[in-house]
Structure formats: C-alpha cells, structure tokens
Amino acid sequence: AKRFSEIGEEVRQAWWLSLALSMVGMLILSNPEVFLSIAKASPEVEAKAVLYLKIIAWGLPASMAMRVMVALHNAVSRPAVITWLQISGLFLKIPLNAWLIYGGLGIEALGAPGCAIATVIINWAWMIAAGTIIYRGKFYQIFSVYEKFSMPDLHKLWTLFKLGAPIGLSYLIEVTSFAFMALFIARLGTLPLAGHQIVANLGTVLYMLPLSLSIATSTLVSQSIGADKPTLAKEVAKSSLIFTTCLCVTVGLIVWIFKYPLLDLYAPPEAVKESAVSLFLFIAFYQVFDALQVCSAFILRGYRVAFIPMWIYAISLWGGGLGGGYLLGFNVTGNIPEIIQGAKGFWLANSASLAIAAALLMTLFVKTAHQFEKEHPPVTT
C-alpha cells in the first residue's frame, strides 16, 4: 500500500507488453483469410472484411496502450476520466464515420473501410489524450509514470504476462464463442442470422451494465486486499454479486415484457422480427447467468486468480456453449426436438454454458476468499 512509484514502473512495463502483444495482433489481423473462410462468405464480402481488418490492425497498438491507461485509472478510482474520454470519442466518431463512409468535402465515399479508418483515428486520439492527462494531471504526478524511461524488465513482464495472459485468453474464449456462434448460425440462412444479430446486439448493450459493475467491484476488492482488509474484500464481493444479480434479473424481466417495443427500435422486416422474438426468452435468462459469471470472474482477478477461470471458460463456453449449440442447432443426433433446433439451440446451449461457468466461478470465489482470509488475517492497529 502507498508504494506509488511502483505503479509508474508497472505502467511502463505494461506498455512494453502491450506493444509486443499488439504486434502479434496486427500480424493476425493483417492475415485474416484463414479465419474468414470458416464463414463461407461470398468472395465480395470476404474481400471487404479482409480490407476492413487490415486497416483496423493499425489502431491496435493505440488500443492496447489505452487499455493499460484504463487499468491505471480504474485501479486509482478515476474511471470517470476514461468515461468522459470515451464519450468525447463517440461524439467525434459519429460524424467522422459518416464523412469517411459516405464521402464529402473532397473525400470519396469509402464504405466499410472508411469506418475502419475512423476507428483507427479515434483509437490514437484516445491514447494521446489519456497519455496527456496522465502527464499533465497533478493527481498522477505521485505515480511518476513519465519520470524516467524503463527498458523491458523480463521478470516484471513475465509477472504481468502470467496474470494478464489468462485474462486475455478468457476474453478471447468469450468473444470467439459468440463469434463462432454467429458463423454457425449463418449456415442456417440469412433469416435466422438476422434475428440472431438483433438479439446479440441487444445482449451486448445490456452486458455493459454487469461489466461496469464488475470492473468497479474488482477495483474495490483489489484495494481492500492491498490495504490488508481481506474481510472487507469478501464483503464487497458478496454484496456486488447480490446487487448485480438482482439488477440483471430485473433487466431480464424488462427485456421479456417489452420485447416487441425493443424489437421495433431495430425496425426489422416482419419475418426477421418473428425470428428474433423467439430468442428473447433465452436472452432474458442469459443476462442473469452472464452477470453472475462476469462478476465472479472480476472478483477473482482482484484476488489475482485468473488461470483456473480461463479453463472454466474454455470448457464451459467452447465445450458446452459451442459444442452443445452445434449438436442442438444442427440436430446432429437426429432426435433433437424441433423447438430447440436452429438458432434457438445455440442460444440454449450458450445460456446453459454461462450458468455452468457462473456456478463454478462462484464456488472458486468462495474457496479463494476463505483461504485468503485464513492466510492473511486482518491487520490490527
């Protein structure tokens, strides 16, 4: 606690790690053909996607560096700074997107690549703005982030990587399970895919609520642990789990009750609307399980536990979610009830996989908190 200068060194080393990882990411994004081939899209669509990803790759270093600064602001209880930066970026990106996509003022219409260029510009603008705030802000001077130049320290980089890699892979597993779900549903036809995309988009928006609460919880748990208050850390974690779950149960009920007005916001054709509405029951349950698992995962990160959760995600989301969804959606065994075939089968399996992940992660949290409290009794003064 209060080892402020060490925070600056951690940030500098994290920037080195983000640079190395962004180079790997750029290499993958610049050669996406093997991944896109899974979708079996038309050559025209694939060509546009390849160009889009190759442009987006140039924004990755800025995005990765920005993630380090986001983590710093969250850790020192200054998330509002990042929030305002992101809101400002959003207001800039909307007209920039429109300009580059549709053209004007001497710029030809670029379409989807224009959107990618706008994203790259905003990513770099965010990074520069956040870096400037840390450099000039009086609050941040105590951390000495820019006090000196640090060469890569292999020991510190490895320490960061050991914790960060499982967290990153957990994100990868979660994102790819959802992405491949869409790719598989695409094989069912444009109608099921359109319905799925509407529900998935709504689910992504709703996910921001438990995600933001989970990030705040992780910060408070980490701060309590750093202050040698393990009992407080456990109490904060439990309170957050209860509050987040109750909130998402309420959200799930609202989504189910107001499914038709919510669908009307997307103004879909009637056939797409019918396809999407059949998935709303799943998203109502999905929100609750998603809230439980993400909150538990972030609490465990506060305890510096990330390796076991990564495997829980892999087995649950890839094995149960994708594997189970494939079996149900495509009626692999030949005796799957029609009511849970197609896109509904994928959503059912995905919801079940999140429920399993949530149960396992909560169990791990209870054991971890109990063990940590036993090994680190509260400091008495």
Identify what each model region corresponds to.
Residues 1, 7, 35, 49, ...:
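Hydrophobic/aromatic residues within transmembrane alpha-helices of membrane transport systems
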Residues 13, 22, 26, 89-91, ...:
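Residue-level recognition of pore/gate-forming positions within transmembrane alpha-helices
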Residues 24-54, 250-273, 277, 330-333:
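Short membrane-interface helical motifs at transmembrane helix boundaries
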Residues 56-63, 158-223, 227, 244-252, ...:
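Transmembrane helix-bundle signature of multi-pass secondary active exporters and lipid flippases
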Residues 80, 91-128, 274, 307, ...:
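Membrane-interface helix-loop junctions in multi-pass transport and translocation proteins
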Residues 112, 116-119, 131-174, 370-381:
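Interhelical loop/hinge segments that connect adjacent transmembrane helices in multipass membrane
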